[in-house]
Amino acid sequence: MSTWLLPENIADVLPSEARKIEELRRRLLDRFRAYGYEMVMPPLLEYLESLLTGGGRDLNLRTFKLVDQLSGRTLGLRADITPQVARIDAHLLNRQGVTRLCYAGNVLHTRPRGLHATREQIQIGAEIYGHAGLEADLEIQQLMLDALHLAGLGRVRLDLCHAAVLGALVDSEPAAAELGESLYETLAGKDVPLLTELTANLPPVTRDALRALPTLYGDATVLEEARARLPNAPEISRALDDLAFLAQQVGGAEVMIDLADLRGYAYHSGVMFSAYVDGVPNAVARGGRYDKVGQAYGRARAATGFSLDLREVARISPIEARSSAILAPWQAGEALRTSVAALRDAGEVVIQALPGHDHALDEFACDRVLVERDGQWVVELKS
């Protein structure tokens, strides 16, 4: 086997792509900071039980596992940073009020999510802890939309769902609860024939409500249809009220309701949301409320957040990240060194062409040159 080959669905990030990813990372983290979010950096490696808290079977299957040579315990390479940030909030920071945290880091998956998807994503996201009201959900959704607009993704559609709708249906009928993750996955995939088969032996009220979920998709008016077709349970009514409020308040995106968009249902406890853009079949960002995740770390806290894959967003972003630069000669001399240093201190990219390599600068747009005029080094437009 050639030594330069990489595993399937693993790839190097080359200069042009890396520059674009880094540009977006800085933009987004700066915007998170402008909203008051503090940066945290969880480790890539943790004990497996910490990484899998509340994540369900899907997260377990996506997590690489290995044995710690020091303790003999099973370790995992993180497949999602969200549980790690919940651990930091619950166990390390231990604050009583509202905490806003953000992060950016690599995650590894045992299996790709799609045919051409990478197994090494660069996950970036933000989380709010300590406020159970819809104000936190609204803020995190607006921050996500702001981040996508900063990335140059113009027309964004926001799909809203609520975990309490399915939760109320399942909790009211033990036979439905026994279907477990197969039910969630079938609804998320909108596999109507399989859903019909799975629910065949359920009581009519629960059966009809579950079969209605994939069809309850559309603008905010579909909520009235949902009220008519779903049981009049308090939990369902509150969930639909929450969605109606958010659909009215969110700005900067087309808002749709999708009561079967249940990806990540395993650890969500309230409003769930996904962002879509034209020409991309899968969501470019996802988020939602997960108030119970902190329980495993000894302290349950109201929590909501979102995340996205920077590599995927960079791939579809129209932002041009090619850097303009100043081309300087390679010469000895204090005056030239001083001029180059001053330009770099001012934030300019200055490339000194090594002898014999004046034209090997394809990755940079050298639109200016540093030339000597009357004993002074000055910047001029490149002819």
UniProtKB/Swiss-Prot annotation:
Pathway where this protein functions: Amino-acid biosynthesis; L-histidine biosynthesis; L-histidine from 5-phospho-alpha-D-ribose 1-diphosphate: step 1/9
Location(s), subcellular: Cytoplasm
One Pfam family in the UniProt entry: tRNA-synt_His
Recorded GO CC terms: cytoplasm
Single Gene Ontology BP annotation: histidyl-tRNA aminoacylation
Keywords: Amino-acid biosynthesis, Cytoplasm, Histidine biosynthesis
Family membership noted in the UniProt record: Belongs to the class-II aminoacyl-tRNA synthetase family. HisZ subfamily.
Function in brief: Required for the first step of histidine biosynthesis. May allow the feedback regulation of ATP phosphoribosyltransferase activity by histidine.
Name this polypeptide is given: ATP phosphoribosyltransferase regulatory subunit
Organism lineage: Bacteria, Pseudomonadati, Pseudomonadota, Betaproteobacteria, Burkholderiales
